[in-house]
Amino acid sequence: KFDLFVEETVTETGFGIELPVKKITVSAQSHELVPVRFHADPAQFDRTGDPLTPAKLNDRARSWVYEVSGKIVLANDTEKLRVPYHALVRAAATKHTTESRIALPNRNLVSLELSLEGDSAHPKPLVSVFELAGVSPRNNLLTDAADISADVLAFGVASDYPQSGSVAETTVYFAISNAGPWTNPHSFLYDPHLQIDTNFDGWIDHELASCSNGGFIKDDLTVSGYADDVFLSILIRVPRAERGLADVGYLNVFPPDEFDTVPFNNSVMVLPIPARMLGLDEEKTDFDFRVLTLGAEQYGYPEIDRTELIRYDVTKPVVHSAFGINGTVMYDANEPIKIAVDRGLAKREGRRPAVLLLHHMNTDDHKLDIVQLDLDADDADADGASDDDELAAGTDPADPDSVFAILPASRKTALGPEIRWHSVAGKSYQVQRAASLGQAFETLPGLLPATPPLNVFIDKTAPKEGELFYRILKP
């Protein structure tokens, strides 16, 4: 006969274990099944680390694995049997885009809002947004989890040059999405190399990689004994006299004491780097790059994937996506994703752009979305609005005088700028405002019902000085 109870070692708010049966009897040379019920309410997870472990290493915030552990104990008067349990627990999401293809209107710079659907148990789910650089087919011959975690599915790039206006102040963001999750992004477990050729001679000049603070301090990414839980974006092969590594920021952009970016048990990552650290300036603004991924140290760092070289100019992004949190590519996945697309540039250079979104909190079932951008949407009446947009707005796609657009009669009044547009019965509208086309548009309060044939709106909250840009949305 045994009494059953639980000894908890590491706990997490919202997680628990229940033993429906508290006593069992096991006859000689037989066995009994003991039910154990694990339950979790991710809304209660407090995402705090082990209180006995320092929150910082070398004054850098560390990332945490949120775990629970303990023992299920079977005891009687003469003996105790202990069955250990351990689990990694985190609040997850099921976010995804509502559209896989968007037709762009006939304008040079197009502002877009990408809507996301799905739930999130995490209070601050993150999604990062990039210009798609390339996709890589799934290697179905790989069977080991360590190899699958290095199999590239998609990669992307972004630049905040449209916001900074200076190469010296520009940050470049690289995105990698793989077929399976790594346990953690240490190079001896998963070894990504974002390889960069800045002089176009076919030789790699720099490599961007994930690394821990310990490996950076020791100037060696390969020794597991140097590893810790402060994850960085590291530039390798920088031509410096003393060291071969340069710290260029946190992996996934934010320090973990600001945002939970889920570096552990994930298959997506973001590697940021200041453009100047690649030797770029106002005269030299472009480079070639690719992704090379290697498997685990225990298998001899086998090459798992190698993409084609892609050219990128930090001053000429087609997809402008650095409108996220703190002016980065990281967004709150509970809010619409605001980006801009330089359709004119894409048309001039013959590019077929797409948007890559990485879902950092999602379960492994859906970690990325790709949204194709159609540059030549159907526009039968050549009024600058696509037929699909006109049908949605209620205007006539065959009549160039019937178009959902701000009218030239809009003017400045003593109360503020007056905006006019053709309206259609039964529709409603929202007004958005921005100080420049390179900035995200702000939605002004209030849903405006249609007053056909014309709607008039006065922006009484507009700043008195400076240029303003407006647009009208039909939600």
Tell me what each language-model feature is.
Residues K1, V36, F174-I176, I419-S423:
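Aromatic/hydrophobic beta-strand junction motif of beta-rich domains
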Residues D376-P475:
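Short, composition-biased motifs enriched in small/polar/acidic residues
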Residues K1, F5-E7, V65, L74-H122:
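Long, low-complexity ectodomains and other extracytoplasmic segments of secretory-pathway proteins
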Residues K1-G14, L88, P192-T198:
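Short acidic, flexible loop segments centered on an aromatic residue
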Residues L109-D376:
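Surface-exposed extracytoplasmic segments
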Residues K23-E32, T261-N265, L448-P453:
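Short proline/glycine- and polar residue-rich coil/turn motifs
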Residues D50-N76:
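A short beta-strand micro-motif common to beta-rich folds, especially ectodomain repeats
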Residues F15-D59:
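Intrinsically disordered, low-complexity Pro/Gly/Ser/Thr-rich segments with frequent PxxP/GP/PP motifs
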